[in-house]
Amino acid sequence: MHDAVTRPTPPADATAWPRRITQAVKIGSVTVGGGHPVVVQSMTNTDTADIAGSVKQVADLWRAGSEMVRLTVNNAESAAAIPRIVDKLRMMGIEVPLIGDFHYNGHQLLAAEPACAEALAKYRINPGNVGFGKKKDLQFGQLIEFAIKYGKPVRIGANWGSLDQSLAAQLMDENSQRDTPWDAGRVLREALIRSAVDSAERAVELGLPRERIILSAKVSGVQELIAVYRDMASRCDFALHLGLTEAGIGSKGIVASAAALSVLLQEGIGDTIRISLTPEPGQSRTQEVVVAQELLQTTGQRAFTPMVTACPGCGRTTSEFFQELAGVVQNHVRAKMPEWKITNPGAENMTLAVMGCVVNGPGESRHANIGISLPGTGEAPSAPVFIDGEKSVTLRGENIAYEFIELIDQYVERTYVRRAG
């Protein structure tokens, strides 16, 4: 096995641990690991054979900020659709790397559809169901041969819902011989890690370069995920994909993902993430991308859009106007960010504050690049605006929202040097 990587010493100041040093994996135009920024990825839930529907959803996820998108490739129709999906996306000016998600029959599909093998930017392989019994090594080897032939990276992703049962049984037998047997949870974690890491080392033996391998070992429990990735990170130098295998629906899924991934990211573990949310009825699939971006931004890993701080409101606030203004401001900067990213680089680092009364309003506003403190109960009907810590102007009347948005736009043009063109 490759030399293990030692966990870094925690910093004494208010920063994350140094990023774990890993292999850098090139996936289309995106680089994962090797000190590069943590990459946001997502997955479609369309029938991949539905080319129009899949193209639309990939485009939506890409526009929301997904830097890689995974699609199910589970039958001949979906495999045949992949090249056409890539072509249609390119016609739209979208060059997002597409990842093929293979289970059970990937070796057959790639053999039958060479154009699919060529069009995909990465293959996801599950060592728990790539093959069973004597066929396992053969079929795993065939998938790796395709990756080598077409120059593609792979993610070897173990999952506790489809764990290699022969390996699990072997480790259970070994555990029964210990003087002090491990509990079942520890044996399960060991099986997940061994499944991923041993499969990766086997891929290297077959000729796949280390810099074309990403690993994951997913579970649904927060503490289990943290334990698995801490252990796996100490055993190898492969880039790691983070995510709960099924985070859940609504706020539960968001909280669970944030609880697990923020700990690992704080410790420098993780090179690409996916938030596996179950969309609520009528909710956009793009929410998982927004949550992933907000998680990385709030933990200081990356900046995607200006962050808006707003107070929750209390008995001191006279209306919901400050809450409405906070929403208007957040929507405005998110809508402007694609333009600012090109013309005003650095605007994504801007901080904004929309506060509802005099208690914390002026102080919080001074901490932001631009902040506004709206009047609370019994306060004068005026709203001082602070820019870079200094009081700039006081807004009054019916046009406070419009005037504050205008101040934000002016600040961006003045502070973040506009690129020509």
Curated annotation (Swiss-Prot):
CC cofactor: [4Fe-4S] cluster
Record keywords, A-Z: 4Fe-4S, Iron, Iron-sulfur, Isoprene biosynthesis, Metal-binding, Oxidoreductase
Gene Ontology biological process: isopentenyl diphosphate biosynthetic process, methylerythritol 4-phosphate pathway; terpenoid biosynthetic process
Chain positions recorded as [4Fe-4S] cluster binding sites: C311, C314, C357, E364
Alphabetical list of InterPro entries matching this protein: Dihydropteroate_synth-like_sf (IPR011005), IspG_bac (IPR016425), IspG_bac-typ (IPR004588), NO2/SO3_Rdtase_4Fe4S_sf (IPR045854)
Pathway in which this enzyme or protein is active: Isoprenoid biosynthesis; isopentenyl diphosphate biosynthesis via DXP pathway; isopentenyl diphosphate from 1-deoxy-D-xylulose 5-phosphate: step 5/6
Catalysed reaction equations from the record: (2E)-4-hydroxy-3-methylbut-2-enyl diphosphate + oxidized [flavodoxin] + H2O + 2 H(+) = 2-C-methyl-D-erythritol 2,4-cyclic diphosphate + reduced [flavodoxin]
GO molecular function list: 4 iron, 4 sulfur cluster binding; 4-hydroxy-3-methylbut-2-en-1-yl diphosphate synthase activity (ferredoxin); 4-hydroxy-3-methylbut-2-enyl-diphosphate synthase activity (flavodoxin); iron ion binding
Domain of life: Bacteria
Cofactor remark from the record: Binds 1 [4Fe-4S] cluster.
TM stretches of this protein: none
EC assignment: 1.17.7.3
Signal peptide positions (record): none
PANTHER family referenced in this protein's UniProt entry, alphabetically: 4-HYDROXY-3-METHYLBUT-2-EN-1-YL DIPHOSPHATE SYNTHASE, 4-HYDROXY-3-METHYLBUT-2-EN-1-YL DIPHOSPHATE SYNTHASE (FERREDOXIN), CHLOROPLASTIC
Similarity annotation: Belongs to the IspG family.
The protein's role, per its UniProt record: Converts 2C-methyl-D-erythritol 2,4-cyclodiphosphate (ME-2,4cPP) into 1-hydroxy-2-methyl-2-(E)-butenyl 4-diphosphate.
Annotated HAMAP family: IspG
This protein's name: 4-hydroxy-3-methylbut-2-en-1-yl diphosphate synthase (flavodoxin)
Organism of derivation: Xanthomonas euvesicatoria pv. vesicatoria (strain 85-10) (Xanthomonas campestris pv. vesicatoria)
Name of the encoding gene: ispG
